A protein has these predicted regions:
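Non-transmembrane, amphipathic alpha-helical segments
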Residues: 2, 27, 31-35, 64, ...
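Short, flexible coil/linker segments at or flanking structured domains
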Residues: 2, 26, 42, 49-51, ...
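Intrinsically disordered, low-complexity regulatory regions enriched in serine/threonine/proline
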Residues: 2-18, 22, 105-142
Length: 142
């Protein structure tokens, strides 16, 4: 095999990898910006309303904003919470919820999209409310 052919293929692979990395960085930056808007305009107000409704029902949850995030934590257990996160592990970055639930000595931890397959910009207040109601079911059963 000729050296020029090998050099050409390696150069093409480097250019493709750099272009892919640039696209990935741009996608991540726009997703972070959209996620910030999502937290501020949708997730925080709806979660605050849910926390108030839970308090009225006698179920104690506290709303917190650790490190620019949003967490709805059960007052009974320090490991019981629902936290909004940006899930960039897939092809399309998504707003997701990290649900941590302790049962005895076990802690169940899972990350669930707010609305599977939906871009962050497409989410609505109803989507956030539906996600929270589903995520809260284990605590509401008690």
């Amino acid at each position: 095999m000729e050296v020029s052919h090998v050099n050409k293929r390696v150069t093409m692979a480097i250019e493709r990898a750099r272009a892919s990395a640039q696209t990935r960085r741009q996608t991540a930056a726009s997703a972070e910006k959209a996620y910030g808007v999502f937290l501020e305009t949708l997730a925080t107000p709806v979660t605050r309303q849910v926390a108030n409704a839970l308090k009225v029902a006698g179920i104690a949850f506290t709303l917190g904003t650790p490190g620019g995030g949003l967490r709805l934590a059960a007052d009974r257990g320090r490991d019981d919470f629902i936290e909004f996160v940006l899930d960039a592990s897939g092809d399309i970055p998504q707003a997701a919820g990290r649900i941590s639930l302790s049962r005895g000595s076990r802690t169940i931890d899972e990350v669930v999209p707010v609305k599977p397959g939906a871009a962050i910009e497409e989410l609505t207040e109803e989507d956030v409310l539906e996600f929270l109601v589903r995520a809260l079911e284990p605590w509401l059963e008690r």
